[in-house]
Amino acid sequence: FDNTTLSVVDSLKATDKNFVILMDSLDDFQLDIESVSNSMMGLLKFVGSMNKPRDVVDIRFCLPTELYRRIIKISSNPNKDFRRSLKLQWTATELILIGAQRLKIYLELYYPDFLHGLGPLDPTGRSDALKLFGAVLPKTITNHAGFQEETISYILRHTQLLPRHFLMLLNSIFRSNGGTQSLNPFPVSEARILNGIRQVEERIVTEIFVAFKLIYPTAEEVCKRCIPELGHKFSVGELHRVYTRRGKAVF
């Protein structure tokens, strides 16, 4: 093992490259259990102490943003354990670029003639990515409130700006295609977009509640009680009144 490690490090140094190891986060952090909390404290100390700026091998432990403040409190020395921490946050543009690359592969497989007719496109560039989406989606869509909205904005609005959410929605929209290349189903109909989102949005909402369950265990029930009582727009005062009347009963 030692020889292998030295060989890898020497190779990375020779090519002036760094190797990053990402330890993915758990799905369920049971931090209210003392043994789990103590284990997490030790893990944070270990990861925080072993990485140095000049190391060619960088080990990164991924933590969900929703639990960041809770985990900071577990750390025995946050200044040391988190001195090289990075917050990863996706933007709408980045999601569009990721989605466009997937979309291009889809078109190459099932609608190559249609894709060829669009001319050369680079889905890693913002302009071409938007052009690709503009070719397969209607420019606007009528939302459930009866207002016109840009289609790509409408789809993104149903995500937490996470790639997996955006890809889940796109997969759902394009999955029920049922057509052939000769039928040319583009732009996708408004009904298919609305139906595709409807089939996935509940799973996304459930995922969000699960992510916050450790910190806000009653959030889902409070939302079920309060949201039906609120309009599309409401003041802080209205929210407070509805919460006092309906939400507090959960506790």
Q: What are the roles of these predicted feature ranges?
A:
Residues 4-11, 15-20, 25-144, 190-195, ...:
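The catalytic "switch" region of P-loop NTPases
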Residues 14, 151-153:
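Short hydrophobic "helix-edge" motifs at membrane interfaces and signal-peptide entry regions
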Residues 147-150, 157-250:
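Winged-helix-like regulatory helical subdomains adjacent to P-loop NTPase cores
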